[in-house]
Amino acid sequence: MRVPLKNYLEKLGLSKLKKEQKEIVTSVLNGKDIIGVLPTGFGKSICYILPHMILMKTVIVISPLISLMKDQQRRYKDVCTIVTSFSQNMDLDDRQITHDQKKDIFDGKLPCVIYMTPENFLSRESWIKGMEKHISLIAIDECHCISSWSEFRSSYTALNKMNKWFKKRPPIMAVTGTATKKTINLVANVLELKNPVYIHISPTRDNLNLSVMYKHDFKNSISIIRDKIQGKTIVYCKTQKDTEKISNALSHWGYVSGYYHAGLSRENRDSVQNKFTLGKIDVLAATVAFGMGIDISDIETIIHYGIPKDMESYCQEIGRAAREKDMQGTCCILWSKGDFVINNIFLKQIDDYELRCKQREQMKGIELYVKNTNICRMRLIRDYFQGTYYSSDGFKCNNCDNCMNKKDFSNHLKTLYI
């Protein structure tokens, strides 16, 4: 007997699906591959949890983020069975699964959603191959890692091995928050997707106030940061040292601040993240270690102390601002010429020539963005991801620093990108 969709949605605490969610779920149910460029806070998890509930077959979600796995396990434990696998163990409700439970999953008697790191997925080839007829979907989160300079790239590019594992491969859903058309095409080719359905939501948003300012010295920067702080705030920094320096300076001015970077112990990072989530810390100075998988909806301000490494990273990071309904967000980049020196140092550490060239191209995009003082910033973002650098449609967000200057230099856009 078919269960009405509204019954599943009620279990998930939803009244209806977004148009794009409905299109993705329908495509999964029809056995189609999908690529989704979906912004932070869109509700990607619904797109693979719901097919699992409807089909009552196992869904595998590949993600590099252990924190995301644990968050999803807490969030959906009352509506489906969530298994996490980021080591040699497989856990159910924070306990290692028994031999009988693992056998039931393998035999299809215990359909579940299995969260796995890409490395763990690749190491379980024989087990996953044996489950073929019980798997309804393989979802690959943060799929832009296939083309990006990150610690996850090698394991992500190896995921195409799965195409040889199955007689009839389950549909693949590859999703990310931001990606250019070049990246999307690369993902589709590497994963060997078959005529994928492409779902794309524009990165432009009308509730973000974007601005760029030049930083002269530390004292000047702290003054600007203090002026920009509104509500819950993240200050993204390029180095671990800067996170501590900025946090200490803001504490001196009476802010309840903290810092977060990969050099801290897991226990300390979890503690800081929890305090920030609960509002016990007003301002968090952080490196990009406080990044993918962070699910905090009431962040009001994102400040970059130094330019991000590329436009993709920048849009992922500002996408964490103003995610609640009717909320207005403030996003500001503080930059200096020295930031490009730091980016070039990181660039030289990339051994892969092709990847190094791609990263250099992406860095050029953010460099043009921060140096521009004429054209609508939201338009620059839109055109970067669409690859339409020569557009002359006169789009203006009327909410960024360039638009607020009430100047129109549309005809200069082509020369800016040459």
Residue ranges and their predicted role:
Residues 351-418:
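C-terminal accessory/connector segments of nucleic-acid motor ATPases
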Residues 67:
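Conserved Rossmann-like nucleotide-cofactor binding loop
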Residues 60-61, 256:
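Gly/serine-rich nucleotide phosphate-binding loop at the start of the catalytic core
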Residues 2-3, 360:
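Amphipathic alpha-helical repeat elements characteristic of tetratricopeptide repeat
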Residues 3-11, 16-19, 23-45, 53-55, ...:
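Helicase motor core with emphasis on the C-terminal RecA-like subdomain
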